Amino acid sequence: MEQLSLLDLMQATRGQLSAAASLDQPIDQICTDSRSLQPGSIFWALRGETFDGHDFLPQAMARGASVCVVDAAHADAATGPTLVVKDTGKALMDFAAWYRGTLDALVIGLTGSVGKTTTRDMIHVALASEFEGIRSRKNFNNTIGLPLSLLDADHRHEFIVLEMGAARIGDIAELAAIASPEVGVISAIGPAHLQTFGSLNNIIQGKGELLESLPTSGFAVLPGDDMILRQMADRAPCPVIFVGEEDDNHLRATRVRASYEGLSFRVDGVDFMVPVCGRHHLTNALCAIAIAREIGVNLQSVAQGLERFEPIDGRSRLRTIGSWTVIDDTYNASPLSVAAACRMLPDLELPGIGRRVLVLGDMRELGSAANEEHRRIGELAASLKIDLVVACGNHADEVARGAEAAGMDSHSIAAAPDLETVKAVLDCWLEPGDVILVKGSRATRMERVLEWLTERARLETAMRGEQRRYCA
C-alpha cells in the first residue's frame, strides 16, 4: 500500500478519530489478524460469522498497533488511538474504493462459476512478462478479501487482477463498485452455489453484473464457445473479445492437445505449452492471452510466461505418489468442475498406465439439485469408461446409482459414508500404475485422501526395503 495519512483514512471512511491520534501520522500497512500484526500497522477490527476482531483489541495494542479501526459500539474498548466508524466492514470497502481512485494501474475483474483462481494466475503470468502487477491474495474474493487485495497495490504496479466471488445476486455489483474494473472476464457459467443463488438464471444474472460495471473505454473477455456467455455479451457497454476453438471467436486456438505433459495449442501462429492437466484449462489460458494481446504484450513473451505456470495445490495438480499418478483437484467441486476433471482421465497417456480411478466427495451448496447433479456425475464417469468410482459423503449413493444406471459394473463402484470407508476400499482396490483423480467440495477435505495415499506409499516403500534387507 502507498504511504497515506490518518487524515486520508478518516476522510475515506467518514470516521471519527480519537484525540490520542495524530492526523498526519503515516500509514502503509493494514492488518485484520492481531496474531500477525507488525508494530505501526493499522488494526482493522472486522466481524465474521465465527469471530469478532473487537475481541482482540488488547492483543493488537500490545503488539504495537498505531491505530485501531472499530465500530461505534466498541469505541471505548481500545486503550489507544482509534478511528471510530459505523461499520468496520463497510468502512474497509469504502477505504479500498477510495484508494482505487488513487491508482493508475489497469484493474482486471474476474468472476465465474469455476476456473477463477487458475484464470487469475494465468492472467498474472501472461502480463508479468512485460508489466509489473499483482493479483488477489490466495482466495480473497469477497467483500473483505477483495479490498485487502486492492490495498496491496502501490504506484509500481501497472495491473491488478482481482478475483470476484458470488453467492447471490448483487455480490458482484458490490465488489465491482469497490474495484472499478476496466477489464472484465467471466471464466465459465454453471450450477455452483445453487443453494444461495436459487437457479442457473440467477447465476447468469449475478455474474453478468461484472460486465455491466465496465466503462465504455474498457473491454470484456468471454469464452465464445459457450452460448450462455455469448448471450451475456450484450450486457457489456464496451467491446467484447470472444475466445475459444470455434471459427467465429476473435481469438482462436488450433492444434489443441491435452496430455500428461500439459496443454498445447496454437494462437496467431504462436505455439503454447501450458503445464496443466486437462483440456478444460484451454479457456482459462485463452482469456489470459486475449488480455495480453489486447494491451500489447508480445505473444511469444506470453507463451514463455505460461510455459512457467505452476498450478496451485488442489487445482488439477499432477502428482506422483508411490506407484500411482494422482490428480490433486481437492480444492473445491461443482458439477461443472467435476465433469471437466473427469474428462481429464482419458487424456492422460502414460507408459504402463493402469486403471483410471475417480475418488469423489460431495459437491456442496447445490440445494434441491444435489441428487440429480450427483447422479449425472456417476453417469458421466460410466460414459468415459472410468474403471473405478469411489464416492464419499451424503450423496455417494446418487453417484453410484448414476454410474450403475449408465452401465458401469456394480463391482467397480463404491458408495462410502465416510473417509475411513474410502481408505478401506482403496486399500483393497488400488494397484500399481493406477491414475487416481481426487476431488470434492472444500468442506469435504478430500486432501486427506492424498495424505493417506502418501502414507500408504511410504509404508510400502519401507516394507520393500525391509524385505530386501532380510533377503540379503
Please annotate each region the language model reported.
Residues 70-73, 188, 224, 393, ...:
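Short secondary-structure boundary segments
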Residues 1-94, 98, 366, 379-380, ...:
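N-terminal leader/targeting and accessory segments in enzymes
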Residues 10-11, 91-219, 224, 230-236, ...:
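Phosphate-binding loop of NTP-binding sites
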Residues 78-87, 237-242, 410-413:
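Active-site regions of enzymes building and remodeling cell-envelope glycoconjugates
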Residues 35, 58-59, 173, 201, ...:
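Alpha-helical segments flanking ligand/cofactor-binding loops in enzyme cores
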